């Protein structure tokens, strides 16, 4: 028991980090009414600024040179030829946090203030993708280590327990309590704090009293980004710095912020510290002999924030504060697919052209785009038609990929794997069917909270679910087999005696897989068209528009949500199995939450309510038909897609496919005018 208590004490440090991030989320929500999914990235970028200043004396700005050559945009400031001390680096990082606060308010959340909730979500996700990709481009994706600013030293045998805890962890928790308590007093006693509370209660009422909502939002965003950046710097003493790791710290921070009802900075602080304590203590139970091996330590750690978020959402539900609800009826358009047969014909023509004239690289890109299109169709059903913002569709695909591979394995060593993958050796069609069914079951499990919540709150649940499921299922060697955490080889698939793939050591051409994937894409398009044009599609759109009105018309809202998630999960599962066939070796990083967010972002760029939008997003997907070959080019493309996603949220939430709407409107008007003239001539 003493070991568990010691681990709980060690969790105070990371809990302090969660607490400050959660406090930043609460402050941003009080000022703008937005739950910021970008909070972890706002801690990550100043932390990289601190590390870079310590190592090289360079200070990078959160942009890059978009037009190298004719117009040189400064993106780096060299303050010293070598690294500088901790204090100048700390001040530079805090200054960077202030810059981020100004940019976030002026360029993103300020213009989105009177936009519908879906646009705010798109903008928040765009900022997350932009900062994460930009950090990977400027600083690299490898782990960075540097001495922080907190004093060194260890408190040996605290409270008579064996072991020790760093003073840095205790100090970070203490700083979190000071920040949380100080902000609680600030919002109760200061003039700006009282004005913030007035705007928070009623934006219209506060505006009528003469308070500037924009000014109040700016002040609160500056506070939020500053304390978040400070947290990112202080946590460097015991947290490994990578773009992905820091960005995903937003998940436990969201759980702590919800503990404070998104309104109380003090309760969010307490929730963050308790969450860190519970996570660390729970990991100690996995070291016991009686603990089941199929529940890994990291999976349990990631499941705790998910459980906290689900419990809070279920108990509080619609009582959680949501601003901007008067714009909730504005949803991206989801028109009936009219020219879908033309689209299918174009897909067949492109496939034939690539089969006969394309290189092996082009064939691989076509396969990637085809699979991405199926995955994005799953999001079209759930997000575009049903109106439920799910960020876990790629996770559903990963579940199907891993479990179908395990079910098809027979104990042989496949490909370049160093491990024999044990399994029942089921035929590939049956293994695929079972893998998709399991993905549907996982999707329905994640969909249960959607019965009670929706919008950004559901996005929070699905994001936490994606993080937890990745570790519990895909990273679980007891469930998946050896190689789950590194490289898991896929058994060569055979369908009715036909080899779907070819050994890469023999040939890079994969004509059979191209035909196989295109057939599945055509089937999925046909299914989605049938859903949209049928009774099910009308029910989905009714639920998306107004759940209460749909219920009054006899629509089973809960059943419609579960059905939508089931269909979307099935489509995602198909995409996952096809990805396994293509890659032949599965890596857990392919299916993480950030990759899933990137997939959804490309769909938003194309048009989330359109089948054609899924096709546009699939063309833009990494390693797709319109991708670049260099890794640097891929990162820059992802960064640009994040910036473009923000622009889409502000100016055109229907996506790039809606750019043709004015042309279609003019053509329709021209045809109507011509028809009218012909009618008049006939009458004469």
Role assignments for model-derived ranges:
Residues 4-18, 22-23, 40:
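N-terminal transmembrane alpha-helices
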């Amino acid at each position: 028991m003493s070991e568990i208590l010691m681990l709980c004490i060690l969790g105070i440090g990371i809990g302090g980090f969660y607490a400050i991030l959660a406090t930043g989320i609460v402050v941003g929500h009080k000022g703008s009414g937005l739950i910021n999914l970008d909070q972890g990235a706002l801690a990550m970028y100043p932390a990289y600024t601190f590390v870079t200043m310590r190592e090289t004396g360079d200070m990078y700005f959160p942009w890059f040179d978009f037009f190298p050559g004719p117009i040189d945009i400064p993106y780096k400031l060299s303050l010293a030829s070598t690294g500088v001390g901790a204090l100048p680096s700390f001040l530079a990082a805090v200054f960077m946090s202030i810059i981020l606060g100004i940019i976030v308010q002026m360029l993103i959340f300020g213009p989105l203030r009177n936009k519908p909730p879906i646009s705010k979500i798109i903008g928040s996700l765009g900022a997350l993708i932009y900062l994460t990709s930009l950090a990977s481009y400027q600083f690299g994706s490898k782990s960075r280590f540097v001495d922080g600013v907190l004093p060194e030293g260890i408190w040996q045998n605290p409270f008579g327990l064996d072991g020790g805890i760093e003073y840095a962890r205790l100090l970070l928790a203490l700083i979190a309590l000071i920040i949380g308590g100080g902000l609680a007093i600030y919002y109760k006693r200061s003039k700006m704090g009282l004005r913030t509370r007035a705007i928070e209660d009623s934006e219209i009422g506060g505006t009528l009293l003469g308070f500037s909502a924009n000014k109040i939002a700016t002040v609160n965003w500056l506070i939020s980004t500053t304390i978040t950046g400070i947290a990112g710097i202080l946590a460097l003493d015991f947290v490994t710095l990578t773009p992905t790791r820091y960005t995903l710290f937003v998940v436990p921070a969201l759980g702590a912020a919800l503990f404070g009802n998104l309104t109380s900075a003090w309760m969010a602080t307490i929730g963050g510290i308790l969450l860190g304590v519970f996570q660390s203590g729970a990991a100690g139970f996995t070291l016991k002999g009686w603990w089941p091996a199929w529940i890994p330590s990291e999976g349990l750690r990631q499941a705790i924030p998910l459980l906290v978020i689900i419990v809070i959402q279920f108990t509080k539900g619609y009582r959680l504060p949501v601003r901007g609800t008067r714009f909730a009826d504005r949803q991206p358009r989801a028109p009936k697919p009219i020219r879908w047969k033309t689209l299918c014909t174009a897909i067949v023509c492109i496939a034939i052209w690539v089969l006969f004239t394309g290189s092996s690289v082009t064939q691989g890109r076509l396969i990637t785009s085809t699979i991405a299109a199926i995955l994005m169709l799953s999001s079209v059903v759930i997000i575009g038609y049903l109106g439920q913002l799910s960020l876990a569709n790629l996770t559903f695909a990963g579940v199907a990929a891993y479990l179908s591979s395990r079910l098809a394995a027979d104990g042989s060593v496949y490909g370049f794997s160093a491990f024999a993958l044990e399994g029942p050796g089921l035929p590939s069609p049956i293994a695929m069917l079972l893998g998709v069914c399991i993905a549907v079951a996982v999707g329905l499990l994640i969909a249960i909270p959607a019965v009670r919540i929706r919008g950004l709150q559901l996005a929070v649940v699905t994001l936490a679910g994606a993080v937890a499921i990745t570790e519990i299922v895909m990273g679980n060697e007891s469930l998946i087999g050896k190689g789950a955490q590194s490289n898991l080889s896929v058994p060569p698939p055979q369908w009715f005696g036909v080899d779907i793939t070819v050994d890469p050591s023999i040939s890079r051409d994969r004509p059979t897989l191209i035909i196989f994937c295109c057939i599945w894409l055509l089937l999925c398009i046909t299914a989605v068209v049938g859903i949209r044009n049928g009774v099910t599609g009308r029910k989905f759109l009714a639920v998306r528009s107004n759940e209460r009105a749909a219920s009054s018309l006899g629509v089973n809202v809960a059943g419609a949500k579960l059905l939508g998630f089931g269909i979307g999960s099935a489509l995602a599962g198909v995409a996952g199995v096809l990805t396994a066939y293509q890659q032949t070796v599965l890596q857990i990083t392919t299916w993480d939450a950030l990759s899933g967010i990137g997939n959804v972002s490309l769909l938003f760029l194309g048009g989330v309510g359109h089948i054609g939008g899924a096709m546009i997003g699939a063309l833009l997907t990494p390693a797709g038909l319109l991708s670049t070959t260099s890794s640097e080019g891929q990162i820059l493309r992802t960064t640009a897609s994040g910036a473009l996603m923000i622009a889409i949220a502000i100016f055109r939430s229907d996506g790039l496919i809606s750019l043709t709407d004015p042309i279609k409107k003019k053509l329709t008007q021209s045809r109507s005018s011509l028809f009218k003239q012909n009618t008049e001539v006939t009458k004469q």
